[in-house]
Curated annotation (Swiss-Prot):
Region: Disordered, residue numbers: 1-34
Protein name in UniProt: Protein BTR1
Disulfide bond entries: none
Name of the gene: BTR1
One Gene Ontology cellular component annotation held by this UniProt entry: cytosol
Tissue-specific expression: Expressed in leaves, stems and siliques.
GO molecular function, one term: mRNA binding
Phenotype seen when the gene is deleted: Higher accumulation of ToMV in infected leaves.
Start and end residues of each KH domain: 34-102, 120-188, 233-300
Function: Negative regulator of tomato mosaic virus (ToMV) multiplication, but has no effect on the multiplication of cucumber mosaic virus (CMV). Limits the spreading of the virus. Isoform BTR1S: binds preferentially and directly to the 5'terminal region of ToMV genomic RNA, and affects the efficiency of translation rather than mRNA stability.
């Protein structure tokens, strides 16, 4: 899964007039319904959004009224080197928060390339697999109508079964700022109709319980970020048969990287010949909160057991 930085922008005047006011009471109620949106940014871009001491993200929350969370440094969406930003609030607050973030990222990128013509860019939304059917619609009718109305390119990735526990798909939007934001309006309105989606507001990594997100309080916090309470970190060492260490590592370290990313635990494997006392099992040391250790231990066992079962069949 390739990693792409995706930015877009618009002038303050465009941002103010782009989103139409609700026409009736039902639309007004929908606009106030709690919702959220998640999207990917590079690690460097995440730092720009946070700002010094959390000043930028605190300002964005105060202006938009939305809550903005990020996955931690080096905690990426599986298969990428991108972090997740989640914005939650009413539809209006979420859209306003997203516009502020994308406008800042694009203005910085635009200053670097010096291009006078606004390029077509990409933004990748993170959407639960269970909610993608509503975006696609029967026979693809809904997504086709969204493409026609917004003029943006919209592509939904297949569910990647390579990564254990991953239940999200990427919805890639390509186009100008106006095209992307119109597509986001349409998609977010459709997602908010799904009660399961609206209730699923936990953290940027709702499927990876081992991760802690970083939160920034919008007012009265002096711009300092607040972390979820962290559990005490411990180390547990387990034994894995020498011939099965390759299953834990994976090709090019893929498996151990996946386990580390999905659980938040740190994993260290002993050198060849360095065995658990009285065995030929290599030492696998797992460090982190108890819950992360348990998850990592389970995933390691599954990697080994799946290969053992194939061998005995």
């Amino acid at each position: 899964m390739e990693s792409t930085e995706s930015y877009a922008a618009g002038s303050p005047e465009e941002l103010a007039k782009r989103s139409p006011e609700p026409h009736d009471s039902s639309e007004a109620d929908s606009a106030e319904k709690p919702t959220h949106i998640r999207f990917l940014v590079s690690n460097a871009a995440a730092g720009s959004v946070i700002g010094k001491g959390g000043s930028t993200i605190t300002e964005f929350q105060a202006k938009s009224g939305a809550r903005i969370q990020l996955s931690r440094n080096q905690e990426f969406f599986p298969g990428t080197t991108d972090r997740i930003i989640m914005i939650s609030g009413s539809i209006k607050e979420v859209v306003n928060g997203l516009e502020l973030i994308l406008d800042k990222l694009h203005s910085e990128l635009h200053a670097e390339d010096g291009n006078e013509v606004e390029p077509r860019r990409r933004i990748r939304l993170v959407v639960p697999n269970s909610s993608c059917g509503g975006i696609i619609g029967k026979g693809g009718a809904t997504i086709k109508s969204f493409i026609e109305e917004s003029k943006a390119g919209i592509k939904i990735s297949p569910l990647d079964n390579t990564f254990y526990g991953l239940s999200d798909r990427l919805v890639t939007l390509s186009g100008t700022f106006e095209e992307q934001m119109r597509a986001i309006d349409l998609i977010l309105a459709k997602l908010t109709e799904d009660d399961h989606y609206s209730q699923n507001v936990h953290s940027p990594y709702s499927y990876a319980a081992g991760y802690n997100s970083v939160n920034y309080a919008p007012n009265g916090s002096g711009g300092k970020y607040q972390n979820h309470k962290e559990e005490a970190s411990t180390t547990v060492t387990i034994g894995v048969a020498d011939e099965h260490i390759g299953l834990v590592l994976g090709r090019g370290g893929r498996n151990i990287m996946e386990i580390t990313q999905m659980t938040g635990a740190r994993i260290k494997i002993s050198d060849r010949g360095d065995f658990m006392s009285g065995t030929t099992d290599r030492k696998v040391s797992i460090t982190g909160p108890q819950r992360a250790i348990q998850q990592a231990e389970t995933m390691i066992k599954q990697k080994v057991d799946s290969a053992t079962e194939r061998t005995t069949d």
